[in-house]
Amino acid sequence: METNILELRNISKQYDGKVVLKGINLNIKEGEFVTLLGPSGCGKTTTLRIIAGFEQPNSGELLFLGKDYLKTPVHKREVNTVFQNYALFPHLTVFDNIAYGLKVKRNKYDVIETEVKKFLQLVGLEGFEDKSVEQLSGGQRQRVALARALINKPRVLLLDEPMAALDVKLRKKMQAELKALQGEIGITFILVTHDQEEALTLSDRIIVMNDGAIQQVGTPAEIYNEPENLWTAQFIGDSNIISNAIFIKDNLVTIDGKKIVCVDRGFGENENQIDIIIRPEDIDIVPVGKGFFTGTVKRVNFKGVHWEIIVKCKERKYLIHSTDRVEEGDQVDISWNVEDIHVMWKEIDD
C-alpha cells in the first residue's frame, strides 16, 4: 500500500457562489479502505463525485497514478460507484443487472456468464441469477450493486453511503461482509458516511471533514484516541472536554486546581491555550479518597453493554461509561490512567 493511486491537490468547489470544498489535499494509497466521514453538507459527497467524474472542481488537480484525471470522462475512469439507492434496473434480473457493464463493452456471452457467476459467488448470491431485483431484500440489493460495480474490475470502488437505508442489525452484517470483500479483492475502497461507528469499523484510514475542509486524517485509533482539534473530538464518539486546564510542563497538567500527570509533551510551560479530552470509558469510579475528584452520582442509564453515568464534581460534570453499577446519590471518586487524557491546542477563530 505504498503507491498513491489517487492524489487530490488543492481541490476547491463552489455552487452558486457557496464554497463547498476549500482546497482539499489528500493522497489515497492503492489497496486501502478509506472513509470520508463528516456531517451532512461537509463536502464528502462532492469530493467523491469529483473523483468519479460526475463533478468538476473550480480549481485544483486530480491525479490517478500520477497522471491528470480531470479530463478523463466518467466511462473511461478506472473507478466505479455504488450509490445510496443502489441504482439497480428494476425491469432486469439479477444476472442482467450485474452483466450490464460487460454487455455495454460488448463482451462475448460465455465471458459474461462466467464473470457473473464468479461475482455472484463472491457476494454470496449463487442461485439468484433469474430473480427480479424487486424480490430482493435491502442487503441482497446491496450485494447486487457491489457485484455490478466490481465486475468491471475497477481500480477504485466508490461507496456513497450504501448502508444508510439498512436497519441496524443488517447494517452491521453488511459492514463485516464489505470489509471481508475488500480484503479479498484488494482494490481501493473509498466510502462516504456520516456514521462514525461505520467509519471506525471499516477503515484503514479516516478523513474527517467539516465545512468543506479536512479536519484530520488518520487510522481509526488515531482519530478516536488522538483527535487534533475540539471539533473532531466532539464529533467522534462521546467526550469529556476540559477547556480551562493548564499545561504546566511536559507530562504535567492542572485540572481544576489539581496537578495530574499526563503523557503529552511539547505544549510549552504554563500554557492555557489547550483543551483536554477524556473519553467516558476511560474514567473509573473508585471509593471516596482513592481518586482525583469527589462527586455525586446524578444519573444512571442502562445502555446494554454499559451504564451511562453522570457524576457531578465541584467544578464540572463527568460523563462515564462503566460496567459497574452505582446508584443515584452515591458519593464517589473518579480516576483515570495517565495515558487516558489527551491534550490538544485550542482552536483559534479566524
Curated annotation (Swiss-Prot):
Topology relative to the membrane: Peripheral membrane protein
Residues binding ATP, per UniProt: 38-45
GO cellular component: ATP-binding cassette (ABC) transporter complex
Domain ABC transporter: 6-236
Catalyzed reactions: ATP + H2O + polyamine-[polyamine-binding protein]Side 1 = ADP + phosphate + polyamineSide 2 + [polyamine-binding protein]Side 1
Similarity-based family: Belongs to the ABC transporter superfamily. Spermidine/putrescine importer (TC 3.A.1.11.1) family.
NCBIfam families: MMSYN1_0197, potA
Protein name as catalogued: Spermidine/putrescine import ATP-binding protein PotA
Organism: Spiroplasma citri
Gene from which the chain derives: potA
